[in-house]
Amino acid sequence: MDGEEVAALIIDNGSGMCKAGFAGDDAPRAVFPSLVGRPRHQGIMVGMGQKDSYVGDEAQSKRGILTLRYPIEHGIVSNWDDMEKIWHHTFYNELRVAPEEHPVLLTEAPMNPKSNREKMTQIMFETFNVPAFYVSIQAVLSLYSSGRTTGIVLDSGDGVTHVVPIYAGFSLPHGILRIDLAGRDLTNHLSKILSERGYSFTTSAEREIVRDIKERLCYVALDFEQEMQTSSQSSAIEKSYELPDGQVITIGNERFRAPEALFRPADLGLEAAGIDQTTFNSIMKCDMDVRKELYGNIVMSGGTTMFPGIAERMQKEITALAPSSMKVKIIAPPERKYSVWIGGSILASLSTFQQMWISKQEYDESGPSIVHHKCF
């Protein structure tokens, strides 16, 4: 392994965004939407060089004429043809590398089905001909990037939220909990409450505008009831937002009502427990001896943990649930949007990791199932 030319590639395929780059870098080189768009209408502009599909930002910018699909739902790949297009785009258009020259580290959701891990492995070796491959659980990588090997990770992205307890670098499967409530649901919820104000966002393209409103203006209230009361008496929290067509809309208590669903999934009609209760439940599923270390190392990761106020609220709620003498610490690193990717970059750069890769030779001898023996 000499220098830059054989740097490993780290690809973190999220439900909403794909983060890709080179091991050893401190941030991903490419971050683009995990979406594939296909034209809604037959091409009428002859000679326009219309493609039959577009990926990422290009799909996003042409969204008015395309049908957009996200091949990763709730963190799990559900459409392999589209997924292959995203990987192809990552290698050739975003990173501009030949995949057959670089080891590739992919990330996966906790509890990813076995057949999915095998399929990922197979596509990497057979379609892209990579020389070496590894797959890592996203939450474990987030913990590494925070400089810990023990802790409990609340990883909330666009498609799924997981709570994953980790001890000495190994995830504790009996304590892993998943909530099918994440950024995309909050965006939909915000659309719904904005429509009560008379603003309508219906198409997949308009949904992206709502996502932008959410990312710029939403926050988590420390005390929801109190905040509702305050906002009804004053307009201090009102903000205006200019739509692409120049229309300006005003958004008030929607700013904190949308993300409140993370703590009260019932707002979305879901029976799940909130992120606070789920984190507590996960800790309680773990051995008594490790709980103290978990309470003291609650690490937030993923774009949906980026709301201002979320760490303080979490601290308050978990402290109320935990035994009274327990020291509760929430770690919310500023780079947590990319902490899964950063953890992958760190892991693949370790000298001790180099013998962990699945080589092409091993794959040719054992087939896709080797992933279960070498990646855990």
From Swiss-Prot:
PROSITE patterns: ACTINS_1, ACTINS_2, ACTINS_ACT_LIKE. Pfam families: Actin. Keywords: ATP-binding, Cytoplasm, Cytoskeleton, Hydrolase, Nucleotide-binding. One of its GO terms (cellular component) is cytoplasm. It is found in: Cytoplasm, Cytoskeleton. SMART domains: ACTIN. It catalyses: ATP + H2O = ADP + phosphate + H(+). It comes from the Eukaryota. Its EC number is 3.6.4.-. GO terms for molecular function: ATP binding; hydrolase activity. Disulfide bonds: none annotated. PANTHER family: ACTIN. Actins are highly conserved proteins that are involved in various types of cell motility and are ubiquitously expressed in all eukaryotic cells. Belongs to the actin family. This is Actin. It comes from Candida albicans (Yeast). The gene is ACT1.
